[in-house]
Amino acid sequence: AEEVDASDVNDIRALIRKAAPDIVVNAVDPRFVMPIFLACEEEKVNYMDMAMSLSKPHPEDPMNKPGVKLGDEQFAREANWIQNGNYAVVGMGIEPGMSDVFARYAEDELFSRIDYLAVMDGSNLTVDGYDFAPSFSIWTTIEECLNPPLIFEEGRGWYTTEPFSELETFDFPEGIGPVECVNVEHEEVVLIPMKVKAKQVRFKYGLGAQFIETLKTIHTLGMDKKEKVKVGNVEISPRDLLASILPDPSTIGDLMHGKTCAGTLVKGLDKAGKPKAVYIYNVVDNHWSMKNYGNQAVVWQTAINPLIAMELIANGSWKPAGINGPEWFPAQPFLDLIVEYGSSWHIREEDSKGIVI
């Protein structure tokens, strides 16, 4: 093991030169995507991540127009990667990642026309002793939930809306049940329209009413701010302070109960031209992942995807070049390996008329 400053490009470059890897897998906070990405570009080494470069709001109209979108900084440099003969596979976790693979599978195998595609994430996870304990980084939770959500529509392109907009209750499978979901900024809304033809794409997060109200309160109090403020003789970011107070998600697995679900809801016409709607999903039970792997459900559900992707690249099933998302590649080889890796994926038929666009 080596210690490295993930914000320092030169520090990361030195570690790459020392380790001489075939690929660098970035599994750290999205704040550090660009330093690691740039270090790999400069050292001409392949790269993979599970979240993309951060967005920046539109300077005049952030609730209607996107500014710098998630991943824009990375895709802007694709010519350099092609020239170097290297690849970067971006957004290769669970969401983004497996959810994008589901979208590609839906287009290839199930639909002749996609009218609506929504990545729907939800869980019934609880944590003993805590009323509010996010199952992954609170820094990232705040970033994606309080930024203006991104939506894609054919003919209009990408646009934004108010945080927590379009509340709906979605019935998640395998006993999770109904959870309140809202629009959230997420990488799939950038990646999927680049390769999958869909009339509308969005991401809806099953936060639940209490979680939503807590995040709204955090925002109202200014505790979501990234900029440092002076407290006595010390300067600290309110968001960093909040992250230090809340429990570390990697340490709460034994206290967690329930299941987490990641999936892609698709509505359109099937290959015969008839109305069709499905929810393609993956569910992980926290008791199962802790018992078998010693990792909580959200962590395990995320971590297997870059491993599967690297195996597919190694055996030639996926052939990345330049900067690619998961939907750049055939879906079936990935889905086959999900089962081999001890997990599963399922298709639930939905009522096409019940999905209002």
Question: What is the predicted function of each stretch?
Answer:
Residues 50-86:
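Rossmann-fold NAD(P)-binding glycine/threonine-rich loop
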Residues 73-124:
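Adenosine-phosphate binding glycine-rich loop
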Residues 2, 89, 202-204:
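General small-molecule cofactor/ligand-binding pocket signal
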Residues 24-26, 48-49:
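Redox-cofactor binding/interface segments in oxidoreductases and associated redox assembly factors
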